[in-house]
Amino acid sequence: MKLTKILILLLAFWLEPLSASPYFSFKKYQVEDGLSHNTVWCAIQDSYGFIWLGTSDGLNRYDGRGNKVYRNVLNDKFSLENNFVEALIEEDQNIWVGTNSGLYIYDRATDRFSYFDKTTQYGVYVSSEIKKIVKTENGLLWIATLGQGLFIYDPKTEVLTQNSIQTSFVWDVCQSYDKKKVYVSSLQEGLLCFDENGKFLQSYRVSSDVNSSDSYKINCVLDVEGEVWLGAGNNLLGRLNRQTGTVENYMAPSLNFGAVRSLLKYTENELLVGTDNGLYLFNRESKTFLRADNPADPRSLSDQTINGMMWDAEGALWVLTNLGGINYMSKQTKRFDYYSPAYLSGIAGAGEVVGPFCENKDGNIWIGTQSGLYFFNTVTRELSEYHIGGVKSQKYDIRSLMLDGDCLWIGTYAEGIRVLNLRTGSIKEYTHSRGIPNTICSNDVLCIYKDRKGEIFVGTSWGLCRYNPDADNFMTITSIGSMISVGDIYEDMYNNLWIATTNSGVFSYNTLSGHWKHFQHEREDSTTITSNSVITVFEDNKGVMWFGTNGGGLCSFDPKTEAFIEFDSALPNKVIYSIEQDQTGDFWISSNAGIFKINPISKAHFRQFTINDGLQGNQFMARSSLKSSEGKLYFGGINGFNVFQPERFVDNSYIPPVYVTDIRLSYLNDEQEVKKLLQLGKPIYMADKITLSYENNSFTIRFVALSYEDPARNRYSYMLKGVDKEWITNSENNSASYTNLPPGEYEFEVRGSNNDHQWNEKTTTLRVVITPPWWRSSFAYFIYILLLMGWIVWIAWRWNLRVKHKYKHRMEKYQIAKEQEVYKSKIGFFINLVHEIRTPLSLIRLPLEKLQEIEHEGKEAKYLSVIDKNVNYLLGITNQLLDFQKMENGALQLNLVSCDIKEIVNDVYSCLLY
C-alpha cells in the first residue's frame, strides 16, 4: 500500500496531464465540396431523406453525393426571391423557407417557390427576418421573426395571427415535452411561455445574477424531458425552475465560450452546447462542461462559431457553423476513440506519430511516440506526457516498450535503451560503443522482448542481442548475423522464438533445444514466406503463427510442412504493420490503407475502416498495437492513436431510400436545359417516367441511397430492362450510362445499400421512353401504310389491266386465226374453182392451136385470133390467181419487166371490142 502511494506521487510529479476525453472528429462539407455558402443557418431532413441546408447564399438540397442549390433567378417568378435562408420546416411534403425578408414555400410537386402571401385580419404580411419555424403537436406553425414578433398559422383554416404585444424580436421557439406549452425566446422580455394555442401565460427573465434586473438575450431554448434549458450570452447556460419560476444559471467564465447559440440532447445525462467558441458537453447531473472539439485538430470543427445542430435519421450529428460550412459526425466515427498528443498539447509535432504500447499491472497504458513517452489512464481517459528523468526538454524517439516488474524498458532510435524504474523514477542507459565489449548491437533499438524463461532479447538495426542480468551487459547473437535488422520478436506456445527481420525473412529459435531455422522468400517456391521484409509476428488463439510483411501481405505458417500460406491476395494493401485478435476470433490488421477486420478461418466478413470511420489516419505504424486486459484494441499511426472495443461495434442498420436524382445527356450539362428538354414539372426523384427524343438516346442516370454515414461506400445494383441481361451489382458508382439506345420503352431499376451493406430490397423504377425520329413516328407509319395500300391497289390495277390486255390480245389472235382459216378456206375454194376454170381453158387452147395451124382467112382468122387472145388472157388471169396463192404462202418470186402501157390498153380495148 505504501509502495502504491509512492508510485502515485512520483507519477503525479513526472506526468503532465493534457486531456480527459477523446475529442469529436468531423467530416466537412464546404463550398469546395459544392455547398453554396460556408455560413449555414439551419438544416432539416425531409420525409424523403434529403438534407436541406439554409445558407447566406441560397437553399441547398444535399443527398450525400451531390448538392442542388436553389437561388434567385432573374426574371423567374417561381425562383427563391431571397437567398439568405435562416429557417426551414417541412409541411405537407413542401418546404417552408424563412429568409431575412419574408417566408417562401417550395412546392415539391412543381419544383417551384411561391411567396407566403397570407395576411392577418389586419392585413399584415410576414415580411421581417425569420429566425425559426416550429410545428407544434396540434398542427400550428409558429413563426419567429425579428421585428414583427410571433406569427401563428393554422394550415387547416389558413388563418394567420400575429402576437407582437410581449415582444417584437423573437429568436427561438420550442414546444414543451408534454406538448401543452410553447416557450419563446425574445430579445426584450427573456423567455415567454404560451399555451399550445398561442395564449400568453407568463415570462421569465435570465441574468447572470439573481438580484440583477439585467436580462440576457436568449438565443436558444430546449426542453429535455420536462427540463427547459436556455442558451444566452456571456458564457451562460440556464435551466428553468418551473416550481419557483426562476432561471438557474450555469456559467462557465473560465471556458470563455461566449454566447450559447444552440442546444441539443446528446445522451440521457448530457447536452451538446454550441457556442461562439466551440462545442461543449454539459453533464446535467454533475453540472460540468467538457470541451468536445479541439481547435488544434484539423479533423475537429472547421469553425468555432456554431449556428445550429441537428440529428438525422441515422443518429448522426450535423453541426452548422458560421464560416466553416457543415461538420458531420456519424455513429461510425464514435466507434473509435481518437487521441493525439500533438492536438492535446496544441504543439505541432508533439508526439503525433505513435509507436509502441505497453500495459502495466493496473491496466493503464504506456505509449511511445517520436517525441517522447506518454501515459494513458484507462479509467479517466486522461492522456499525460511523462518527462523521463523529470527533464521536459528530453525527448526520445521511442520504438519499443517492455515492462519488466517495476522497470519500463524503452528502446529508442539512435539513443539506445533507457530503463525507467517506475518506483523510484531513476533512469539507466544502455548504448552501443565500439570500444567497449558486450554493449547492445546498435543504438537503433527496434524491439525488446522477454521470453518465458525471463531472458530479454533486443532487436536492433544491426542484429540481435541478449541481456545478461548478472553482468549487466549484452551478448550479440551471431546465429542471425550482424547485418540483419531485427524488427519483431515473439515466443510461441511451443517455445519457439520467432525473430522477424526487415531484410532476411524470419528466424526461429527453439529455447529448449537451441536449434535455429531460417525461412526466406524464394520467387520460384510459393510455399516460402511471401516477403523477406517481415514487419510483425503474431500467434492466434489456436497457436497458428502469422506474419505481416512489407509488400507481401499476410501469411501463416504450417509447422507440419514448414510451408507458408498466403492469406488472401485480394487484400487492399500488402503492407501489414500489426495484428490483433478480438474476443470473437476476428483479426484486426493495421496497414497503409486503414484497419482491416478479417475472420482468419472463413475469410468472410471482410471490413475496411479508414479515416472516414474515425481512424487517426489511413497510415499506421509498425508494431504499434495492443490488446488490453479488458479487451480493448489500441492502434497507433502517424496522427495519434485509436482505442475501441470490437465487441461493441454495431453496424449501421438504417435502410436508406433510393432515388433517381438526375439525368445527364451526352452533349448537354446545363441542368435547367435538361429540365426543359425533359418537360418535367416536378423533381426527377418524384417522376416515374421520362421521355427522350431519338437525338438524346445517350444519357447517364444518377441515383443515390440517402445514407450519410459514408456515402462513398453505399452500394448499388441496377438494371435497364431490354438492355442489361442481368443486374449490375456491388457498384459504389452512383450512376449508369447508356449510349445509342434504339427507340422504344425501357424500365430502369435500381436498389441501394448503406455503408454497412444493409440493402433496401425495394426497387426504385423509372420508365425511359425514347421517341423515334419523325420518319419512324406513328403518323409516319400511318402514311407509310397508306402509301403501301395505294401501291398495292396500283399494282392490282396494273395486274388487272395486264390480264385484260393479255386476254384481249389472245382473243384478237384467235379472231385473226379464225379469219385466216376462213380466208384460207375461201382461197382454197377459189383456187379450186380457178383450177376448174383453167382446165377447160387448157382443153380449149389445145384444139384452138390445132385450128390455128390451119390457115384461115377473113373473119374466121380474125375470130380465131380473138378466141386465142382471150383464152390466153383467161389463162394468164388464172395463173395470176394461182400466183396470188403463192404470194400468200410466201413462195412467189416477182419477175418485173418493163412494158408499154399503151399496148396493154390497146389489148384490153381490143378484147372488149367484140
Segments (PLM) and residue ranges:
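Residue-level "micro-hotspots" composed of small/polar
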Residues: 19-47, 51, 73-85, 122-127, ...
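Residue-level detector of Asp-centered blade-edge/turn motifs that repeat once per structural unit
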Residues: 45-48, 89-93, 135-138, 175-179, ...
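Conserved beta-propeller blade signature
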Residues: 50-52, 94-96, 141-142, 181-183, ...
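Primarily the dimerization/phosphotransfer
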Residues: 808-853, 883
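Short alpha-helical segment of the dimerization/phosphotransfer core of two-component systems
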Residues: 869-877
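Helix-loop junction within the histidine kinase core
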Residues: 885-896
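A conserved beta-strand-to-alpha-helix junction within the catalytic ATP-binding
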Residues: 895-910
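Conserved small/polar residues in nucleotide/adenosyl-binding loops
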Residues: 914
